[in-house]
Structures are given as C-alpha cells and as structure tokens.
C-alpha cells in the first residue's frame, strides 16, 4: 500500500471528524453552558439560569475551548476509531487490502466497514478513552470557563490559574469520571449506531428509500438513515451514562470538596438525592442527540466525498 493511497483515506476521517465536531460545538454551545450551570448548583433550574443570562451572546460563553475540544477531539477520535475498525476488519479478512474498496463490507448508507457488535463496543470505548485523556486539559478549561464559579476573562487567565493553584494535575481533574462516562457512552453509541443503520432502512417508509446507480443509498436517504440512527443511539447512550457526567462536572468545578469519583457519588446520594445524579440530563440529552446527528451526518458524507 503506497503512501498516496493511505493519505486520502486517513485524512478523510480527520477532516470529516473535525468539521462535524466544529459545527455541532458552535451550534449547540448554549445547551452545553446551561447543562454545566445546572449541574454546579443543587438548587439550580433551567429557568433560573436563563433569567441570569443578560444577553443572548452570553449563551455562547466558552465557545472557543468547547469548539477546540470538540473539533480536535472528534477528528482524533474518528481517525483513531477508523484505524482500529479497519485493522479488525482486515484481520477478519473482510478487508484483505485497504486499497480495494470492493472487499469492504458496508452498510448501504455508509462507507465505514461493518463489524460485530462486540467489536463496535470495544473499539468505540477504547478510542474514546484514549482521545479523552489527550483532550482532558481542554475539557477542564471549557467546564470552568462556562461555570459561574470562575470569572475568567481569557483562556490564558484560566490556564495560569489552574496551573498555579493545582499544578499539571489540575488539567486532568475528573479524568476518571470522564473516562467512566465517555468510554461506555462511545462504546454503546457505536454499537447502537451501526445496528440502527442496518435496521432503520427496514422500517422506514419506502418513499424515503432511494438508490444511486452504484446500488448504495442516495445522499438524501443515507443522510436520513445516518442522522436518525445517530440521534436515537446518542439519546439512549446519554441517559445510561448521565450520572458519570454529573460526577465529572462536580469534581472539575469544586476539586477541594470532591476529591474522587466515589466520594462525589456518595456525597450527592447522601446529601442531595439519587435523581441529582441525572441533573442536567435534559440539556445533555438534547445536546448529545443533536450533536451526534449533526457531527456524524457531516462526517459520513465528507468521508464518502474524500475517499
């Protein structure tokens, strides 16, 4: 396999992931900001936080670190995920040669290789855990920038404050809870997403199903299938992993009070109530579902164009 043959394939996942992540991050930043503020205060409500917003532009506070984290993280994650899934497909002789597209087992709505449910679960979880660690410093800065507990006026001030007060460890605060949230979420998401792409065309009305001359779905049909699959899969995976998101946010906002995942979990259950573990779920559910629909819809179509 030549370098020229490898480059377009790998770069297509990098480009598709970057622009898909960037678009979803900027468009949905208000939901992320509101979710963070609801989670930081046990008495907070959506309406209370909305009343504290002085202008619509404040809903996009923290967009820069959020956009950096999501675009770079999405590009790295989807590139890493593709390498892992392609390697597994090659081992199973589904892809004897990565330069020969006719050997790849595809869904008709996608140009991604088809794997078993267990392989989708494991590759999704491992890739997300790895990339989550790499992008953790941006995540910590993003969460604190969105919060009302810290009044940072610039990214430089945020970085300096965290390093001065907590050292390098401060940039990885809450990684355990983040990994416990993101790795299972990503594994479940990839499993459900790939399965949905197979099942959804069977239940969609025939007027939505159109084929191109090559036998695959048209852009309209594949976008409908992929986006709907992404929204449904993200909704279920988000609900299951919601408690880890609350724990992670509390640890990053109040590191002196919440020192580890178990301590944070027991404190919330004992001093508040179990339902508080799902605090901000409505905001996260809306954001994650829409984000997955936007990001994966763009990603799948860009990959097809560049491959």
Swiss-Prot record:
Its main location: mitochondrion. It catalyses: glycine(in) = glycine(out). Solcar repeats lie at residues 8-87, 115-199, 221-305. The chain crosses the membrane at residues 14-39, 62-88, 121-146, 174-197, 225-251, 280-298. The keyword Repeat applies. GO terms for biological process: glycine import into mitochondrion. One of its GO terms (molecular function) is glycine transmembrane transporter activity. It is found in: Mitochondrion inner membrane. It is a multi-pass membrane protein. The keyword DNA-binding does not apply. GO terms for cellular component: mitochondrial inner membrane. SUPFAM superfamilies: Mitochondrial carrier. Keywords: Membrane, Mitochondrion, Mitochondrion inner membrane, Repeat, Transmembrane, Transmembrane helix, Transport. Mitochondrial glycine transporter that imports glycine into the mitochondrial matrix. Plays an important role in providing glycine for the first enzymatic step in heme biosynthesis, the condensation of glycine with succinyl-CoA to produce 5-aminolevulinate (ALA) in the mitochondrial matrix. HAMAP family: SLC25A38 (MF_03064). Belongs to the mitochondrial carrier (TC 2.A.29) family. SLC25A38 subfamily. This is Mitochondrial glycine transporter. It comes from Saccharomyces cerevisiae (strain YJM789).
């Amino acid at each position: 396999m030549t370098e020229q043959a490898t480059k377009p394939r790998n770069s297509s996942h990098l480009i598709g992931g970057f622009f898909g992540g960037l678009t979803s991050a900027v468009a949905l930043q208000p939901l992320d900001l509101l979710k963070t503020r609801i989670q930081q205060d046990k008495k907070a409500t959506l309406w209370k936080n909305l009343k504290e917003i002085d202008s619509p532009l404040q809903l996009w506070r923290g967009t820069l670190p959020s956009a950096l984290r999501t675009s770079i993280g999405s590009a790295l994650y989807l590139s890493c995920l593709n390498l892992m899934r392609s390697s597994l497909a090659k081992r199973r002789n589904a892809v004897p040669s990565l330069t020969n597209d006719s050997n790849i087992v595809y869904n008709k709505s996608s140009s991604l290789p088809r794997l078993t449910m267990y392989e989708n679960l494991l590759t999704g979880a491992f890739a997300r855990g790895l990339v989550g660690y790499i992008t953790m410093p941006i995540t910590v800065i993003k969460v604190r920038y969105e919060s009302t507990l810290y009044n940072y006026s610039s990214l430089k001030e945020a970085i300096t404050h965290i390093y001065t007060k907590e050292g390098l460890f401060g940039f990885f605060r809450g990684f355990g809870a983040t990994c416990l949230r993101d790795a299972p979420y990503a594994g479940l998401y990839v499993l459900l997403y790939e399965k949905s792409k197979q099942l959804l065309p069977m239940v969609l009305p025939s007027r939505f199903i159109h084929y191109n001359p090559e036998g695959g779905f048209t852009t309209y049909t594949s976008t409908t299938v992929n986006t709907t699959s992404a929204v449904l899969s993200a909704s279920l995976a988000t609900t299951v992993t919601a408690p880890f998101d609350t724990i992670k946010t509390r640890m990053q906002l109040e590191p002196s009070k919440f020192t580890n995942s178990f301590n944070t979990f027991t404190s919330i259950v004992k001093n508040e109530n179990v339902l508080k573990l799902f605090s901000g779920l409505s905001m996260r559910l809306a954001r994650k579902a829409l984000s997955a629909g936007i990001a994966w819809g763009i990603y799948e179509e860009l990959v097809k164009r560049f491959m």
